[in-house]
Amino acid sequence: MIERSNSTPSATPVRPPLAVDEEYNQAFRSKSFLDLWSHAHHHLTHTFSSFKLSTSTPCAGRGGAREDDFLHAGGDGGAADDSEQSCSYTVLDDFVLEPSPESLARGARLQQRRRRRPRRHRVETLLIEYFDVTEEACEACSALLAAIGAARRHHLTLRRLLLRLDGGDDDDAKDALARHVRLDNPLSPGSLSEFHDVHARCSPLASRLAAAQRRLRRLARALRIARGTAAAALVGACAAAIVAAVVLAAHALVGIGVAAAAFGATPAGAARWWARRAAEKVSSRHYARAGATLDAAARGAYIVGRDLDTVSRMVRRAHDELEHGRDVARIAMRGHGERPLLQEVAREEEECEEDLRAQLAELEEHVCLCLITINRTRRLVAHEMARGLPPPSPATVTTTSEERLTSS
C-alpha cells in the first residue's frame, strides 16, 4: 500500500508583472527616434536658459521667494529639470527632408529631357502633389513643435503670475495676469492653421492616389487581354493564309508565289508594325511600374494622414488643458484676493500643470515619429520611382554635372 505524502504541493510560481511601460518604450522609441530626439536637444538647449533669464525678475515678499523656488528648485521632485529638457525642444531646424526638393526638381528635369514631347501626365501630377503635401506636413510639424514650446512658456508665466498674486502684489500682478490671459492660446486652431490645412489635404490625396492606382491596374489588365486577343487573331490570320496557299497550290504554281508574297507582306508585316507601335506607346511593364509607385504614394499619404489624425487629437486635448488653466486664472483675477480662493486656484493649477506637462511631452514624441514617418514614406516613393527610370545617357550625365558645377 502506497502511503500518501503529507507534504503540500509546491505553489505555482508567480509570474512577474508585465512591464507595459518598458515594452512600450522599447517599441515606441526606436533608434531613429532617439537619434532625432537627442540631436534636437543638443542643438536647442539654450532656449529654456534664455527664457529663464528673461523671466527671472525679482519679486517682493513671500511671492517672490515662492516663485524662485518654483522656477529653480522644483519642489515636485525634479519638475524643473523635466521642464528644462522639454522647453529646449521647440523648433527642429536641422531636420533633413529626404529626398530634398532640389533633388526632386532635378529628377523631373531629367525625365522631361528624355521625352520627345514634354507633357505632364496625371500620374506625375499626383506624385508632385504628394511630395508637396509631405513637405508642407514637415513644415507644419516643425511649427507645431514651436507651438508646444510656446505653450510651455505660456503656462509657466501663468503660474509665475499667480504666485505673485498670492504673494500680495495685487495690482501689478493682476494687471500682468489680465494682459497674459488676453493673449491667444498657442495651441488654438488659428495659431496652427497650416497644420490643420495639411491634415485636411492628406485624406483626399490618398483617395485620389488609390483611385489612380486602380485605374492603372484596370488598364494593364485590359492591355493584357487585348494583346492576347490580337495574338489569337494573328495566329488565325496566318493559319487562314496557309490554308489559302495550299488550296491555290493545288491549282497553279503561280498561286503559291502570290500566297507567299501576301503572307509575307500582309499578316507578318502588319504584326511587326503593330508590335513596334505598341511597344513605343505603352507597355504592361510601364503600367506595373507606375502602379507600384502610386501604391507606395497612396500608402504613404494614408499613413501620414493617420499620424496627423492622432497628433490633431492630442493637440486638441492639450489645448483644452491649457485653456482650463487660463480659465482658472481668470477666476482668480476676478476675485478680491480671498485666501481660500487663491489656495484652491493654486491647487488646481498644480494639477493642471502635471497633466499638461505629460500631454505636451507625449505630443512631442508623436510629432517626432510623424517626421520620421514622412521621411520614410518619401524615401519609399522615391525608390519606386527610381526603379522605373532607365539608366541615364552620357549626354544627360554631362548636362547634370554642368548644372551642379554652375549651381555650386
From Swiss-Prot:
Its main location: membrane. It comes from the Eukaryota. It is found in: Membrane. Keywords: Membrane, Transmembrane, Transmembrane helix. It is a multi-pass membrane protein. GO terms for cellular component: membrane. Belongs to the UPF0496 family. This is Putative UPF0496 protein 2. It comes from Oryza sativa subsp. indica.
